[in-house]
């Protein structure tokens, strides 16, 4: 262990112990509060010539935390810096180092991203010094992302309460964090230390063991520190749990239960509803169910089976936690493996872009579907049932379903809404409860800017997750098949913004040089869509297309295939055309790449951020010339292979599942 401390004769009243790890970008609030503490009038009056020290213990940070603290400690005689010899992975060892080096009458543990409350600490010190308490606890101010503050962990006590009565009051009404004012002599006398082998619940174990040995406990009705709650799952130092965390959780709970049992108490009865509810919500969110051993799950479940008599009487606030505790108590491993997965609800009126991902999502999630028959119609009882069930809610399309869910989602649930493109012309984004939405998903980078500009959404909530492809599921083109180089396709020619006439113009230009070129039109013809007949502009456009075909003798060169299974057919067509005026991402040409062929694009806005720029052409003439230049099979296959790799590396379904998983677990 290295240190940067001074040998001082000063007798400190208070030692503030601050463990740090990779905190260089978030320690400002903590440092500011400590700098202000020394000049706080009430504290100065209380301490007189005596004062306090601050001990920073860096857990071998890999960023600039140590260097930043080293520079700051050189400015203050009462600030000292220590560093572990290697990263220990938890605050336990740094806190123990702080206990060993502290010289104050009292010790206070402060996390490096929180701030100390000068008023509360002064009151706690005054009470401790007056009544010689072993420890003094206070409330906590929670700062939600700098936008909202609330006071938690307030309890009612009286001056004549015994230590045991204080323990009951504290355990019933507070989370047992270690941020209390501790008498240093009390900690040393009872050899009270944090368990360095425990990363989950280490402060709970320490606090319960210490309170069990205390004979005098005080409380001040003021916050001792401000807990700076961060967005994006920032409540926990770890964002993914493994079997080790499961074992540590229940081991910690059992040790706490044993400590309370020494006084004839049960922590599970006093606070188990909140401790287990909170912890299991984190387990559900952060445990990767595909990466945990059966033995770890069995060890975890055994705790719930052992205490099922107590747990049976507890009604947890989270519905999923209730069901999970019941299954853990029963101990059936197969059922536990399923119930411990997060519950994902997919909702919306047209789920064709999301449903194919469900089988893969089910490896990590329980998945249910609330599919609305139309954009506005749904069975409300069905939606309410699955809303009550869900942990995470994915609403497809920024339409009526997104508004409905935003008005009803619980604060503990995570709601995300995916916008494709056409929603920009609707007003649902103006109606949505913005505070209830954790993230808005767009399918292309340019759609992010469109969404923010149209609805003025918070930029921090707008994310880009591209559409997915089952890149390995397409029938692959025969690399020796030269005929496919003369076969064009357009997937979806209606409405007119899809640019069908421009596709015909490309075909006509190609046939001027080589009559082998043909065009296949996949999807419904305009003649099959009644709404086209009722739209004069659309009707006139497709009449012009028919006239162009006849005028340029293309009748035998254009095939209307109707609906086709693109997984099985797109390999036959060397070029799939994207002629649109505007798109979100345009899936069809991407399918061509997946099958070992090529997608070619006119420059609709944002296309260069979705597909390779080398496949984007300024106009019809440039696109036609490129296709002619690709009549060399070797050149064609080289570009096709590059496009195939691009699709796999950027848009494969496995990447989409990982992106969704990361979004929900960190939203």
In which residue ranges do the predicted regions lie?
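Conserved donor-binding/catalytic core segment of Leloir-type glycosyltransferases
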Residues: 12, 480-498, 504-511, 519-520
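A conserved acidic beta->alpha catalytic loop
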Residues: 33, 58-68, 86-88
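Nucleotide-activated donor-binding/catalytic signature segment of Leloir-type glycosyltransferases, i.e.
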Residues: 77-80, 533-562
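Glycine-rich, basic loop-to-helix element that forms the pyrophosphate-binding segment
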Residues: 84-102
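Short aromatic/hydrophobic "clamp" motif used to bind/position activated sugar donors
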Residues: 107
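Donor-binding/catalytic cores of nucleotide-activated saccharide
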Residues: 114-220, 225-246, 250, 256, ...
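Membrane-interface aromatic/basic loop that binds lipid-linked glycans or pyrophosphate carriers
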Residues: 288-340
């Amino acid at each position: 262990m290295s240190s940067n401390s001074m040998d001082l004769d000063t007798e400190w009243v208070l030692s503030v112990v601050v463990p740090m790890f990779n905190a260089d970008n978030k320690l400002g609030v903590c440092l500011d509060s400590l700098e202000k503490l020394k000049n706080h009038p009430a504290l100065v009056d209380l301490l007189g010539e005596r004062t306090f020290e601050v001990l920073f213990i860096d857990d071998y940070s890999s960023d600039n935390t140590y260097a930043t603290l080293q520079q700051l400690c050189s400015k203050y005689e009462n600030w000292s810096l220590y560093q572990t010899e290697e990263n220990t992975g938890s605050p336990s060892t740094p806190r123990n180092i702080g206990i060993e080096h502290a010289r104050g009458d009292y010790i206070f543990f402060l996390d490096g991203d929180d701030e100390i409350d000068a008023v509360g600490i002064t009151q706690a010190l005054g009470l401790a010094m007056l009544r010689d308490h072993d420890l003094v606890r206070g409330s906590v101010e929670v700062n939600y992302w700098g936008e909202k503050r609330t006071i938690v962990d307030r309890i009612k006590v009286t001056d004549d309460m015994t230590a045991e009565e204080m323990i009951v009051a504290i355990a019933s009404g507070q989370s047992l964090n270690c941020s209390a004012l501790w008498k240093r002599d009390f900690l040393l006398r009872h050899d009270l230390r944090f368990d360095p082998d425990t990363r989950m619940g280490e402060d709970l174990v320490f606090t319960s063991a210490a309170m069990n040995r205390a004979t005098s406990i005080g409380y001040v009705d003021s916050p001792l520190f401000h807990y700076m709650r961060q967005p994006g799952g920032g409540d926990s130092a770890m964002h993914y749990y493994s079997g080790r965390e499961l074992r540590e959780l229940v081991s910690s709970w059992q040790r706490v239960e044993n400590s309370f049992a020494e006084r004839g108490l049960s922590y599970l009865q006093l606070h188990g509803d909140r401790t287990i509810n909170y912890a299991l919500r984190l387990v559900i969110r952060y445990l990767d169910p595909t990466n945990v051993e059966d033995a770890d799950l069995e060890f975890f479940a055994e705790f719930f089976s052992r205490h099922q008599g107590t747990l049976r009487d507890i009604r947890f606030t989270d519905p999923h936690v209730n069901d999970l505790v019941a299954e853990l108590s029963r101990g059936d491993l197969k059922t536990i493996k399923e119930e411990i997965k997060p519950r994902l609800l997919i909702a919306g009126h047209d789920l064709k872009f999301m449903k194919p991902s469900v089988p893969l999502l089910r490896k990590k999630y329980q998945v249910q579907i609330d599919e609305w028959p139309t954009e506005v119609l749904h069975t409300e009882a069905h939606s309410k049932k699955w809303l009550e069930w869900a942990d995470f809610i994915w609403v497809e399309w920024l339409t009526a379903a997104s508004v409905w869910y935003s008005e009803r989602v619980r604060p503990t649930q995570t709601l995300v809404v995916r916008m494709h493109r056409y929603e920009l012309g609707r007003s649902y984004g103006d109606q949505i409860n913005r505070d209830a939405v954790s993230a808005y998903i767009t399918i292309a980078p340019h759609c992010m800017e469109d969404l923010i500009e149209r609805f003025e959404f918070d930029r921090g909530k707008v994310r880009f997750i591209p559409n997915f492809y089952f890149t390995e599921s397409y029938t692959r083109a025969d690399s020796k098949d030269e005929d496919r180089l003369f076969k064009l396709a357009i997937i979806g020619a209606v409405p007119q913004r899809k640019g069908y006439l421009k596709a015909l113009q490309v075909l006509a230009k190609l046939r001027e040089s080589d009559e082998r070129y043909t065009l296949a039109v996949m999807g419904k013809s305009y003649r099959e869509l009644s709404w086209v007949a009722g739209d004069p502009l659309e009707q006139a456009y497709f009449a012009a297309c028919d006239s162009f075909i006849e005028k340029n003798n293309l009748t035998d060169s254009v095939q209307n295939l109707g609906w086709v299974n693109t997984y099985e057919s797109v390999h036959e067509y060397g070029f799939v055309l994207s002629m649109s005026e505007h798109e979100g991402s345009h899936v069809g040409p991407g399918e061509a790449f997946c099958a070992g062929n090529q997608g070619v694009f006119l420059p609709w806005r944002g296309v260069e951020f979705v597909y390779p720029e080398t496949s984007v052409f300024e106009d019809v003439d440039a696109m036609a010339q490129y296709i002619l230049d690709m009549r060399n099979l070797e050149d064609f296959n080289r570009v096709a292979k590059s496009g195939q790799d691009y699709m796999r590396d950027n848009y494969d379904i496995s990447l989409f599942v990982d992106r969704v998983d990361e979004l929900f677990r960190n939203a």
